[in-house]
Curated annotation (Swiss-Prot):
Its EC number is 2.7.12.1. CDD domains: PKc_CLK. The gene is AFC1. Residues 447-467 are annotated as: Disordered. The active site is at D240. This is Serine/threonine-protein kinase AFC1. GO terms for biological process: regulation of DNA-templated transcription. It comes from Arabidopsis thaliana. Keywords: ATP-binding, Kinase, Nucleotide-binding, Serine/threonine-protein kinase, Transferase. It comes from the Eukaryota. It holds the Pfam family Pkinase. The lineage of its organism: Eukaryota, Viridiplantae, Streptophyta, Embryophyta, Tracheophyta. Belongs to the protein kinase superfamily. CMGC Ser/Thr protein kinase family. Lammer subfamily. Activator of yeast transcription factor, STE12.
Length: 467
C-alpha cells in the first residue's frame, strides 16, 4: 500500500518537472541573444558590449609582419608582438582618415601600445612620417604611416620586401636605412625605421642653399655611390635618387664663417654657414625601387634628376641611378638643382645647353610621345618650341658644365668635372657604373695623396648645434 503511494507521488513530481522543463528551457533559449564572434584585432572600433577579459594564463601566439604577407595569418589577427602585456585600452579613439586617406592623429596618441607619437616629421604622396617613442626598446624611431589607399598599400608591401632584402645582406647597416619592424594599423601600413637626421635637401634649405665644401661633397658622393653599387649588386634599381632621399645619420652641425659673404653686410647669421658635424649618410625611400627583370618603360625619377633615356622613352636600367647621382653632386657643389624645370622640352634644352647636343641614335629611337620635341631628324625644336620668355631665360642662363663647376669649386675641379661628365653621359651604355665611378681619381687621388677626410671643425671659433 505504502509503495503504491510512493510511486504515485514520484510520478506526480516527474510530471511537474517535465512541465517546468518544457516551459522554462525554451524560454531561456529564446531570451538568450546570440553573440557575434568578437574580432581579435585590439584596435577595432569598440563593440556594443565589452568583450570578456582574456584569461591571465593564456599566452597567445606571436605574429610578425611577414606572416601576414605570406597569408599564414588571417587579416583580422593583429600581430601580437606589439602587445607584450601592455594594456589594450591604450588605443586612441577611432577617427576617420582625412579626404586623402592620411591617418589622423594627435601628438601623444599611440600606434599600438608599443609606439607613442611625439611629432610629425614630414609628409609625402605616400603618407606621413611620425617621430615615435618605442616603449619596448626605449628608443626614438621614425614610423612611415602609409595612406589607406590600395595602390599605396601595395607599394608599401613592395618597399618592405626591398628593405628586408637590403637589411639581410647589409651586415654593418651602414648603407641604407634599417627597417626595425612593420605592422598594419587601422588599414594603414606602418613601417618602423631607425631615427636619422635631416635630408641633404633640408640641410641645404635651412642653410639658405649654400653649397657644401668640395671635401664634404667627395665624402657624400663616395657613400652615395657605395650605397647604389650595393643595391645594383642585388639587382635592385632605386629610380628615385634625390637629396630628399639621402639622410644624414646625425642632426648635429656646426657654424663656420662663410667667406663669400664676409665682404658685405648681410642679415642675421648669414656671415656663417652650417656644416654637418658628421658626413655619414644613409639612403631612404625604396617605394619606387624595382628589380632588373621588371618592365622598365614607364616614367621614373623626380623631374630634376630624371635621365634622358626616361624622357625619350627608350627604356632605362641601372644607369638612370648614375645620372641622378651626377645631378645630385652638382647640386651639392652649387646649392641649386642643375635642371630646374617641369616640362620635357625645356628639360632637354637645358641638357643640351649644359652638356651639348643629344646623340642622334637616341633621338631616332625616341617613342611617339617624344617625337614632337624634335624637328628635321634629330634636331631639338628649340627655341622655336619654347612656351614662354621665362622658359627661354631659364635655359640661356645655364653655363656649360665645366664653367658651372669652376664657379663653385676652388680645387679638385678638374677631377670633379671629369667624374660628372662620366655620370652625365647621354648614352646609358657609355655612362659610368657605380663601382667604376668609385675608382675615379676624384675619390682615389685623395687617398693616394693622404688627404685627410672631411673635417667640419677646422676653425677655433665654432658653435656646435643640433637640428
Amino acid at each position: 500500500m505504502q509503495s503504491s503511494v510512493y510511486r504515485d507521488k514520484a510520478s506526480s513530481i516527474a510530471m511537474i518537472l517535465e512541465t517546468q522543463r518544457n516551459v522554462e528551457f525554451p524560454h531561456r533559449i529564446v531570451d538568450k541573444r546570440p553573440r557575434k564572434r568578437p574580432r581579435l584585432t585590439w584596435d577595432a572600433a569598440p563593440p556594443l558590449l565589452p568583450p570578456p577579459p582574456p584569461p591571465t594564463v593564456f599566452q597567445p601566439p606571436l605574429y610578425y609582419g611577414p606572416e601576414f604577407a605570406s597569408g599564414l595569418v588571417p587579416n583580422f589577427v593583429y600581430p601580437n608582438m606589439f602587445y607584450n602585456g601592455l594594456p589594450r585600452q591604450g588605443s586612441p579613439p577611432w577617427r576617420p582618415d582625412d579626404k586623402d586617406g592620411h591617418y589622423v592623429f594627435v601628438v601623444g596618441d599611440t600606434l599600438t601600445p608599443r609606439y607613442q607619437i611625439l611629432s610629425k616629421m614630414g609628409e609625402g604622396t605616400f603618407g606621413q612620417v611620425l617621430e615615435c617613442f618605442d616603449n619596448k626598446n626605449k628608443e626614438v624611431v621614425a614610423i612611415k604611416v602609409i595612406r589607406s589607399i590600395n595602390k599605396y598599400r601595395e607599394a608599401a608591401m613592395i618597399e618592405i620586401d626591398v628593405l628586408q632584402r637590403l637589411t639581410r645582406h647589409d651586415v654593418g647597416g651602414s648603407r641604407c636605412v634599417q627597417i626595425r619592424n612593420w605592422f598594419d594599423y587601422r588599414n594603414h601600413i606602418c613601417i618602423v625605421f631607425e631615427k636619422l637626421g635631416p635630408s641633404l635637401y633640408d640641410f641645404l634649405r635651412k642653410n639658405s642653399y649654400r653649397s657644401f665644401p668640395i671635401d664634404l661633397v667627395r665624402e657624400l658622393g663616395r657613400q652615395l655611390l657605395e650605397s647604389v653599387a650595393y643595391m645594383h649588386d642585388l639587382r635592385l634599381i632605386h629610380t628615385d635618387l634625390k637629396p630628399e632621399n639621402i639622410l644624414l645619420v646625425s642632426s648635429e652641425y656646426i657654424k663656420i664663417p662663410d667667406y663669400k659673404f664676409l665682404s658685405r653686410p648681410t642679415k642675421d647669421g648669414s656671415y656663417f654657414k652650417n656644416l654637418p658635424k658628421s658626413s655619414a649618410i644613409k639612403l631612404i625611400d625604396f617605394g619606387s625601387t624595382t628589380f632588373e627583370h621588371q618592365d622598365h618603360n614607364y616614367i621614373v625619377s623626380t623631374r630634376h634628376y630624371r635621365a634622358p633615356e626616361v624622357i625619350l622613352g627608350v627604356g632605362w636600367n641601372y644607369p638612370c641611378d648614375l645620372w641622378s647621382i651626377g645631378c645630385i653632386l652638382v647640386e651639392l657643389c652649387s646649392g641649386e638643382a642643375l635642371f630646374q624645370t617641369h616640362e620635357n622640352l625645356e628639360h632637354l634644352a637645358m641638357m643640351e645647353r649644359v652638356l651639348g647636343p643629344l646623340p642622334p641614335h637616341m633621338v631616332l629611337r625616341a617613342d611617339r610621345r617624344s617625337e614632337k620635341y624634335f624637328r628635321r631628324g634629330a634636331k631639338l625644336d628649340w627655341p622655336e618650341g619654347a612656351t614662354s620668355r621665362d622658359s627661354l631665360k631659364a635655359v640661356w642662363k645655364l653655363p656649360r658644365l665645366p664653367n658651372l663647376i669652376m664657379q663653385h669649386v676652388d680645387h679638385s675641379a678638374g677631377d670633379l668635372i671629369d667624374l660628372l661628365q662620366g655620370l652625365l653621359r647621354y648614352d646609358p651604355t657609355e655612362r659610368f657604373k657605380a663601382r667604376e665611378a668609385l675608382n675615379h681619381p676624384f675619390f682615389t687621388r685623395s687617398r693616394e695623396q693622404s688627404i685627410p677626410p672631411f673635417n667640419p671643425n677646422p676653425h677655433p671659433f665654432l658653435y656646435n648645434q643640433k637640428n
